[in-house]
Amino acid sequence: MAYADLKNCKIITAFITPFHEDGSINFEAIPDLIEHLLAHHTDGILLAGTTAESPTLTHDEELELFAAVQKVVKGRVPLIAGVGTNETRDSIEFVKEVDEFGGFAAGLAIVPYYNKPSQEGMYQHFKAIADASNLPIIIYNIPGRVVVEMTPETMLRLAEHPNIIGVKECTSLANMAYLIEHRPEEFLIYTGEDGDAFHAMNLGADGVISVASHTNGDEMFEMLDAIEHNDIKKAAAIQRKFIPKVNALFSYPSPAPVKAVLNYLGFAAGPTRLPLVPAPEEDAKRIIKVVVDGDYQATKETVKGVLRPDY
């Protein structure tokens, strides 16, 4: 059922966590943010991922966040819960808790960070999580954050597990092409790189788990819709204008830029939690001009070339 729920999700938004100035979660801001996303082509929502600043959230806070979002969404789109840590036992305990909590199509588990496990260690980590829970698991492969990279061969070994249903892939397009070519049936492949969505979808990926969909969901939808209708020329034209906006959204450690834009648009995204800090005021103004207005003079002042940042 989880595969069927997610198969038609082209744009899954990696939801921010709105905070008050004192650092507490701003639950009152969640309804407006969710309705904004759903009005602008979000097909699914990931909670407690990187963009949510999950390393700064306690498990209790994550469960409170889950309850608040479920109350607003009311089953209109599938939800994915961030469940993974760099400690296998903790990941198993939390994925069981989230499974019992209910209301999620899948759990997203990150490749363990800091520990620097081998490929066999990664395999055993995800196998243990998937064995322990009924909640389907999506692997999150993001070497820029965790230092180690799961190889396509290890990924395909794990793809044979009946409870591992997909991957959020943030490596190379070459790796993505290999995975798409060799994946088993009913294994979902999402890019986690907004700037790669055009290429990934043309290669045959299932969708994108996105930060930019908070602010530019309509553009992303138009691009993916053009690809689906084989209008590559139109999709490429949208992509060329979209890339500078993505670059601006990642010109400071995420989610600081997207929160700056959302705050400007009138959504109470609030600040980031330490150790992340907001983008400096003048840079935030330029980011807003790029993302909201497509101001390419601001683009030149904000980012140089195509960014592939580690954040």
UniProtKB/Swiss-Prot annotation:
Q: Which residues bind pyruvate?
A: 51, 209
- GO: which molecular function terms? 4-hydroxy-tetrahydrodipicolinate synthase activity
Q: EC no.?
A: 4.3.3.7
Primary localization class, coarse:
cytoplasm
Q: Which UniProt keywords apply?
A: Amino-acid biosynthesis, Cytoplasm, Diaminopimelate biosynthesis, Lyase, Lysine biosynthesis, Schiff base
Task: Choose any GO biological process term that the UniProt entry carries and state it.
Answer: diaminopimelate biosynthetic process
* Protein's cellular compartments: Cytoplasm
- In which pathway is this protein known to take part? Amino-acid biosynthesis; L-lysine biosynthesis via DAP pathway; (S)-tetrahydrodipicolinate from L-aspartate: step 3/4
Which Pfam families does the record match to this protein? DHDPS
State a GO cellular component annotated for this protein.
cytosol
Q: Where does the record place the catalytic residues?
A: 140, 168
**CDD domains to which the protein is assigned, alphabetical:** DHDPS
UniProt site positions, description: Part of a proton relay during catalysis: 50, 114
Q: Which HAMAP family match?
A: DapA (MF_00418)
Checking PANTHER family in the record gives:
4-HYDROXY-2-OXOGLUTARATE ALDOLASE, MITOCHONDRIAL (PTHR12128:SF66), DIHYDRODIPICOLINATE SYNTHASE (PTHR12128)
Q: What is the name of the protein in this document?
A: 4-hydroxy-tetrahydrodipicolinate synthase
The species this protein belongs to is Streptococcus sanguinis (strain SK36)
Upper lineage is: Bacteria, Bacillati, Bacillota, Bacilli, Lactobacillales
